[in-house]
Amino acid sequence: MAKQHITTHHSRGRGGRRSARVASLIMATTLLLAGCAGETPSNPEWPTPHFSPDMELPSGSRYVDGNVPAQPAFDTADPWGSIRPDAKPTAARIPSIIERGRLVVGVAQSLNRLGFRAPETSNLAGFEVDIAHEIARDIFGDPNRVEFRYVESRKRDDALHSGDVDIVARTMTITRQRQKSVEFSIPYLHIEDSILTRKGSGIKSVDDLQGKTVCASQDFTPGLLVSVMKPKRILHTQVWTDCLMAMQQDQVDAIYSDDAILSGLQAQDPNTVLVEVGQASGNYGIAMAPPGRAKDGGRDTAGLVRQVNSTLERIKKDGTLSKLYDKWMAEYLGPQRALPQKYRTPEESAKLGRQRAKYFHDVLKPRKAAEAAEASLKSGSGGAGEEDGAADPDDASRVGGASGVGDHRPDSASASTGSTNGGEIYE
């Protein structure tokens, strides 16, 4: 049976953050990073003394009973293609970014080997960070003309819609559901759902997790995990490194996510082993606001997608992507996997535009209005409205309005929780 595309439904639960571990939401402060493209992978090992399961859980973590109804986990529809690069020069594609003089990128800072602070230098490093540098290189001729902002996983879409960042390079799986909210590049990394467990645990597949305790980020709903496995209980943590700590303290038996994220944890503890689940697969892509949907009107969004895709095509052809993969990922994931390169037709763009219009109208706009009303009650100030935009199929997402969309079914779980995301299985 063919594997299905990875997707989950996110909750918007809030909790305290361990400041040394991860930034909350999007930090107001930003980092103009220079010279970190040469960082090399490091495998800082966690201490492995004997622990007791009675020890205090990582901050903000909680157990959830595994006896809950299963929730559909996978988005089975093939994603739409991206926007094909054109022959325009960079200055014509993204004039406002050229004028600003730097690319603003949303990244992680605690996902080892993907986006993290190198312990030796405190510089941001990782596979996704290096890809962002390559995008900046093609725009400015300088890979360091990039400003990194730390983005919490559940706020990635919001960061794009608000214009806080130009692009997000942070473990975002391309799914058709999510394409209603954001625009994606062509893929840069293939992922598979997996389990990380201790060597000698006896866990060889998801069947071995029945009656066990499984850890996952709080972005996973319990129903999703129950649909994949039959755990006795689930430990929800705020960051993935807390799952590793909990497993080292014998508080959980395994960690469930995709193999890219789990390989970063495995690199930190040689006493762990990665077990492929084989039920879902997907591809990471660079995310951008849909044309016409950013706070500033999204005037450069279609051009930015074309620019990013030009870079991804270039680094595939000249071997740069393979070199970056070998540097950061190959040690634990094995040889680089094949990546699709699919671009959509004008007719497909028009159909996607109508789906986006309905999604923004039916799901996102009410959610933002509710958030604005809540903020107004707390601060005593008024809320803000939503901006509109329009152009051709790839230069605005509102073509065709909200009518005539026969295949759009707003995700009920997403709508009820206020999530902007179609979902993924990672932080």
Annotate each predicted stretch with a short phrase.
Residues 171-180, 248-249, 253-282:
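A ligand-binding cleft/hinge motif common to bilobed small-molecule-binding domains
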Residues 52-88, 220, 286-333, 426:
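Extended ligand-binding regions for polar small-molecule ligands
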Residues 146-158, 235-249:
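Short helix-initiation/N-cap motifs at beta->coil->alpha
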Residues 32-35:
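C-terminal motif of bacterial Sec signal peptides marking the signal peptidase cleavage site
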Residues 189-197, 263, 267-309, 331-358:
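Periplasmic-binding protein-like
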Residues 133, 137, 144-208:
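Acidic, polar ligand-binding/catalytic clefts
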Residues 47-168, 408-409:
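Extracytoplasmic small-molecule ligand-binding "clamshell" domains
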Residues 37-40:
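Bacterial signal peptide processing site
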